[in-house]
Structures are given as C-alpha cells and as structure tokens.
Swiss-Prot record:
One of its GO terms (cellular component) is cytosolic small ribosomal subunit. The gene is rpsC. Keywords: Ribonucleoprotein, Ribosomal protein, RNA-binding, rRNA-binding. One of its GO terms (biological process) is translation. Belongs to the universal ribosomal protein uS3 family. It comes from the Bacteria. This is Small ribosomal subunit protein uS3. It comes from Helicobacter pylori (strain P12). NCBIfam families: rpsC_bact (TIGR01009). Residues 39-107 form the KH type-2 domain. InterPro entries: KH_dom, KH_dom-like_a/b, KH_dom_type_2, KH_sf_prok-type, Ribosomal_S3_C_sf, Ribosomal_uS3_bac-typ, Ribosomal_uS3_C, Ribosomal_uS3_CS. Part of the 30S ribosomal subunit. Forms a tight complex with proteins S10 and S14. One of its GO terms (molecular function) is structural constituent of ribosome.
C-alpha cells in the first residue's frame, strides 16, 4: 500500500500537516477549495523563479493568511518589499479579499522533493539526458543530508515511440514505515515529444517523540556505498 499511495497523504496527522487549514461549513467548503486552488496556481506561476516548495493557506473568521515556503525568499520580497506588494495586489484582484503573505526559506533546497522534481523537469525541457538529470539531483540530495532518494520519470523518454517508466534509487526509502519522514514532490516537463511526469521521494530520517532521529547504528558501521537500483518498464 505504501508503494501506491501519496506518502504525504498517508502520513497526515502522524508526522505531516495539512496545507489547507480551515474548518468550513458545508455551504462554504466548495468555494474555499476553489479559492485555494486559484491561489496556488497564481503563486506557482508568478513566483516560479523563486523555487516555491510549499504553499500553506490558513483561514480564521474573515482573515486569510498564505505562507510561501521558497528556496530564494529574497527574490519574492524584492527591494524594500516592492515585489511582495505586487503579489498581494494580484491576489486581492483574483479572489476579491485581503490577503496577508508570509515568506519562509527552505533550509536545505537540495533535499526538498518538490524542488528536486521541478529541477529534473526543467532539465528535461532543456533536452538534458534524463539519466544525467536524475543522477545529478540524487547526488545533490544525498550530499545535503538525505538518507535516501528515489526518482521516477514516465513518458516518451529520449523521444522514444513507446512511453515507459524508469526509476533510480539510492539509500533507503521506507514507504511503508509511517514514522519515516518522507518528502514527496511531483512535476511535469513539457517536452517536444509530450509531457514527462517526474516523481521524487526523499527519506530524511525517522520521526520519534524527540523529533527526527537519524540512524546512528548504520552510521557507526563501516562506510559502504549506498544501495543503488534501477528499473525500466515498457
């Protein structure tokens, strides 16, 4: 089951939180969901250059607060906050409501699954070989402290006539372990041959009562090369 479902949805309420946080009535729920979708699409499009990892939307009474987690927050804020004010005005025009925006920085961008997936997708659009793009992202994540990473690409790879799926994995990615801190990201590459889907899973450690505890026993053993595996399917 852990291999099939979204790893974030599987761990909601355990070690992951919702990205839309509000309690609506049955009457307002559809409009709130549609509004959240519009906000996310707008911010993803307008702030693509800043490396947006996550967008959290919170509602309380008539207040709406949006938290943008990005790799380059300085580009969003701009000089003296000019750029962030433009984004606020754009959101206000879109949803006809006052919005407060908070900006947070991603601590380790190379170990963020969403940013890694978008990185691979961008390289594929620039016609970089898919294997090279995947391995480059995997090496960067492991150097940033990730315990394991799995990258999967699907579509007409290298312009092949028949679409297929290929994936690489290094280290451990325990998808069935609910206490495992698994970060998941998805992106699409718009190539001349069609759309290529990119999925990334990154294992950051196990979440216990005192936070994330990394595997000390494994680190104490003699150093050995991380496990590598690859699979292609037509």
């Amino acid at each position: 089951m852990g291999q099939k479902v979204n790893p974030v949805g599987l761990r909601l309420g355990i070690n992951r939180n919702w990205t839309s946080r509000w309690f609506p009535s049955a009457r307002t729920a559809p409009s709130n969901i549609d509004e959240d979708n519009k906000i996310r699409k707008f911010l993803k499009k307008e702030l693509y250059y800043a490396g947006v990892s996550e967008i959290v939307i919170e509602r309380a009474a008539k207040k709406l607060r949006v938290t943008v987690v990005a790799a380059r927050p300085g580009l969003i804020i701009g000089k003296k906050g000019v750029d962030i004010e433009k984004v606020k005005e754009g959101l206000k025009t879109l949803i006809k409501k006052e919005v407060s925006i908070n900006i947070k920085e991603v601590k380790r961008p190379q170990a963020d699954a969403q940013l890694a997936a978008e990185n691979v997708a961008t390289q594929l659009e620039k016609r970089v070989a898919f294997r090279r793009a995947m391995k480059k992202v995997m090496q960067a994540a492991l150097k940033s402290g990730a315990k394991g990473i799995k990258v999967c690409v699907s579509g007409r790879l290298a312009g092949a006539e028949i679409a297929r799926t290929e994936w690489y994995m290094e280290g451990r990615v325990p998808l069935h372990t609910l206490r495992a801190k698994i970060d998941y990201g998805f992106a699409e590459a718009m190539t001349v041959y069609g759309i290529i889907g990119v999925k990334v899973w990154i294992f950051k450690g196990e979440v216990l009562q005192k936070g994330i505890q990394f595997e000390k026993k494994e680190e104490a053993k003699e150093e050995r090369e991380p496990r590598r595996s690859r699979r292609g399917r037509q």
